[in-house]
Amino acid sequence: MHRRHFLALGFAALARPALAAPTPYRLGPGGATITYLFTLNGGEVKGTVPVGRANLRIDPGNLTASTADVTADIRRARTGLIFATEALKSASVLHADRFPEARFTSTRVILGAGGRISGGATIDGNLTLRGVTRPVRFAAELFRKRGSAPDDLSALDVRLQGRGNRSDFGAIGYADLVEDRVGIDIRADILAA
């Protein structure tokens, strides 16, 4: 009797559908763009920082289990103004020579309306910049490619937006010319790996 019970349990376990695991994603041909916005002497200036590495995992069955671990190459940060770019990478701001990478690691996904990563969704995480780690929150959107089938999650578009104070990370240089508040807008084209 014990043997039959054991076999029945074994077959029941085999019959259960496998639990879905998070799917790894990589950057697609469109890559990722991190755009930052800051105020320099009263005018808005935009710059970009390229993504160095991205380890992304999305779990369609449990979106709150999705994760992101992304680095940006601070040495390649750019603005439209050469003097602003050099000041940005200087020791008193990003100190690119000593801290060549920034890193974001997600800690929590909070879903928006309808249980989706859009419509009010946020991603919390830790941002390390200049060797200083602080918690940050981004408004998050995750979409299928336009024209794709409803169940086609092979190619997705991601957008994250947030704001923060550069002084929280010790980037205090040129405070007489550059406001403390910085906006961040990240757009990424990702593909299932």
Task: Say what each PLM segment does.
Residues H5-A21:
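N-terminal export signals
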Residues A20-A193:
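Low-complexity, acidic/polar, glycine-enriched regions of mature
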